[in-house]
Amino acid sequence: MAIRRIDAAGPRARDRPRRWLEPRPLARRAAARAVGRFSPALVGLGLGLLALGPGLAPGFVLSYDMVFVPSPPFSALTFGLSGGPPRAVPSDAVVAALSRLMPADAVQKLILLLIFVLACSGAAALVAVRGRPDAMADSPDMPRRPGTAVADMPLAARLAAGVCYAWNPFVAERLIIGQWALLLGYAGLPWVLRSLCRGGERIRLGRLAAALVPAAVGGVFALAVTALVALPAAVSRGGRRERARRLATVVMLLGAFSLPWLIPALLIPVHTDSRGVDAFAARADTPFGAAGSLLMLGGSWNAQTVPRGYGGLASVVWLAVVLAALAGYALLARPQRCCRGLGVGALAGLVIAVAGAAAPGRAALTDLVRAWPGFAVLRDGQQYLAPLALAEAVGLGVAVAWIVGAAKAAVAGDHPPGRGTTAAIRVPAALGVLGMLAPVLLLPGLAWGAAGRLHSAHYPASWQQARRIIDGDQHPGAALVLPWAAYRRYPWNGEEALYEPWPRLLRRRVIWNDALQVGQQTVAAENPDAGRLAPIVSSSGPLMARLREAGIRYVIVDAGPLLARRTSGPAARAWLPGASVLLADRDLVVYRLP
């Protein structure tokens, strides 16, 4: 008689699958958390690579105010002590310091990519700081408990918010005009708001200080945009005493980070032209007027910085997306107070921008600038749309979460259990992907280096040689740069407009014309040296004696007809009699005065 082997675990144990063959729940959850945590940053990196395109090649991306130079020196200009408003403080000093560790063009690429990574991941992290709208409670794609963490928010919703914040007309126009320092503060804005809204009422000083670092590096305008949100967020939580404590903490940090540019601004008188109010006023770049363009995050004062293809039929669809995002913020995000203070900052920024676009607002702002030059920070009002961009990104994110959840519930309800599973997955997934891709599809002009406008360029070898000659001279005296204009269009930079690079290239004091021509308007120079030299440069006849009296040691001609007409011969001798031509080629002529 055969004896049957008895399994001590019972007959059912043989029917159960072996646990080591099953996927491990802990590993699965860890992988899901990793995907949810790092996806926004990776998507931001992908957006940065797509936006920069040819600009990622070796060399420098040089466009309007985006002036990076090889091995930038520390000079008086770096610290805002050369005259004029210290707009590039401390951003130039940070770049100069980082360029001691790696090539300056690599520093530039890392900063530009960091802007997209911080912006996308920050907006994604902000979408669900706490709570969820009641309207989303029945969504099967949302957590059932009353509090929710960022990791519980649908990934599609977080990515939609991140993509919208990192890829929009505001980012495109500010990137083309070269205001990377402002965009650095823009990228850090959601992290500042998150540090003020997350956790208890008491501010964690270290976390807030770390979140403010991008704005601190960006300087005055980056900090001004950040303050527009940080101050109302500080007083939006706690009782009266706690609100006062929070406000004092935020003001203290903002003040401390403002010292690098505030000190030179107080030490050296700042001169501003009130005509800049009209020159820098917002302009319509869509069929919906200046106010509509601003609501859609466009409206830059410089018409040359509008992305190619923007403003046509795609702008109509983009307006619909913006209105849906604003509705999502007002109806879904704001009731849960997940981004306290953001609505106030967004509204204040929009009011500042619209005021500059209207005649009464421009008149009032002109009077303010005449009364105190510090109000000149409000001339370019479109830059204060940064909080509105964040509000629209958050609104789009929660709207996508609501739509995806509602679609999943509707599809699942239309099919019996066990059927329609594919549709229940594909339809919400398609809606989520569409929400993520909408900003990119509607603004293709930002892709591939803004349609080729942002590309890499190399400074000519003669420029490096001229720098060695001029900085190696121990005799005192400034360098005068001609032609007498603020912007250049160098052939070696593809004829793209670029702000004069020589002040950042030389350690010696450089005098150039920083007056700005906008259409038929001229905004007067802000550097007192430029105002002093303007009558001399514009006069006819020999300039040698007057330039020497003005303290000029070198004259640099780097563009225009002066290169061909005054390099040598009788014309050059009559213009600067006795001057030595140290270097002359098709890109540059350098004169040294005796």
Task: List each language-model region with its residue ranges.
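Signature aromatic-anchored transmembrane alpha helix within multi-pass, membrane-resident enzymes
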Residues: 252-255, 397-444
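Membrane-embedded helix bundles of polyisoprenyl
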Residues: 44, 120-126, 150, 154-238, ...
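Extracytoplasmic
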Residues: 37, 41-45, 436-594
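Membrane-helix boundary/interfacial segments in multi-pass membrane proteins
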Residues: 171-183, 347-395, 402-411, 416
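Membrane-interface coil-to-helix junctions
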Residues: 44-121, 163, 167-175, 180-184
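Membrane-interface helix-loop-helix junctions at transmembrane boundaries of multi-pass membrane enzymes
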Residues: 239-245, 324-364, 410, 418-427
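Transmembrane-helix motifs of polytopic, lipid-linked glycan transferases
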Residues: 110-145
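Periplasmic/ER-lumenal interhelical loops and adjacent helix-loop junctions
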Residues: 78-79, 250-330, 381-382
